[in-house]
Amino acid sequence: MRLIPAVDLKSGKAVRLYEGDPARETPYGDPVEAALRFQEEGATLLHLVDLDRALGTGENREAVRRVAASLSIPFQLAGGIRSLEALQEALSLGASRAVVGTVAVKDPGLLARMLEAVGPDRLAVALDARGLEVVVSGWQEAASASALDLLRAWAEMGVRTLLYTDVRRDGTLLGLDREVVARVRAAWPHELIVGGGIASPEDLHLLQALGVDGALIGKALYEGRIRLKEAVWRS
């Protein structure tokens, strides 16, 4: 199982949000320092999120460029990618893969065009949900779509990588909801990356046992609950 450190960008800084709430952020300083530390500890892929772009409050293009220039490992970029132009820009900034969420839920036609433009290896889809209740627009808006129906539709469209985040648990260090993760794993036939609430090595063991392909880890790394070098070795 691949361990993927997450670096969320807000106003050029690395932060973590509690349950996706922009008003409840914990700052963690220079994103380049965080990215380099994770790389040195053995990460083989980094997950970058432009929170300002996702929330419509700005963008962190320069911070992304700085992180990209500092890394020798690949990174994937998420946050506010809601047009073909934004997709191409994300890849031009150096991302090996772009991650889309709101578009995949609200505009399947655009998702199909994105897949056609760059292929399934360079485009992943994010299912952000409170349990299985889907949320969009930077996690600020509930969607009426059924999570399991979306998974079936995306698989049929040719999506090959899914990032599932349980927003209820993101940034909380509360651990995983085993039942929900198991349901997502059972419904998704391709590569599955899971985040939201991972707090301990035991959570990583649970994901491995459920057959999950990758773990998105944020606050647990910043707070020292999980030591990446040791976890990478054990995985």
Curated annotation (Swiss-Prot):
Catalytic residues (UniProt): D8, D128
Enzyme Commission number(s) of this protein: 5.3.1.16
Pfam family, one: His_biosynth
Main location: cytoplasm
Gene3D superfamilies: Aldolase class I (3.20.20.70)
Domain of life per record: Bacteria
Record-level Gene Ontology MF annotations: 1-(5-phosphoribosyl)-5-[(5-phosphoribosylamino)methylideneamino]imidazole-4-carboxamide isomerase activity
GO-annotated biological processes: L-histidine biosynthetic process; L-tryptophan biosynthetic process
Class in the EC hierarchy, top level: isomerase
Keyword Cytoplasm: yes
Reaction equations catalysed: 1-(5-phospho-beta-D-ribosyl)-5-[(5-phospho-beta-D-ribosylamino)methylideneamino]imidazole-4-carboxamide = 5-[(5-phospho-1-deoxy-D-ribulos-1-ylimino)methylamino]-1-(5-phospho-beta-D-ribosyl)imidazole-4-carboxamide
Pathway: Amino-acid biosynthesis; L-histidine biosynthesis; L-histidine from 5-phospho-alpha-D-ribose 1-diphosphate: step 4/9
Keywords on record: Amino-acid biosynthesis, Cytoplasm, Histidine biosynthesis, Isomerase
Localization annotation: Cytoplasm
Record keyword Amino-acid biosynthesis present: yes
Gene Ontology CC annotation, any one: cytoplasm
Similarity field: Belongs to the HisA/HisF family.
Name of protein: 1-(5-phosphoribosyl)-5-[(5-phosphoribosylamino)methylideneamino] imidazole-4-carboxamide isomerase
Species of provenance: Thermus thermophilus (strain ATCC BAA-163 / DSM 7039 / HB27)
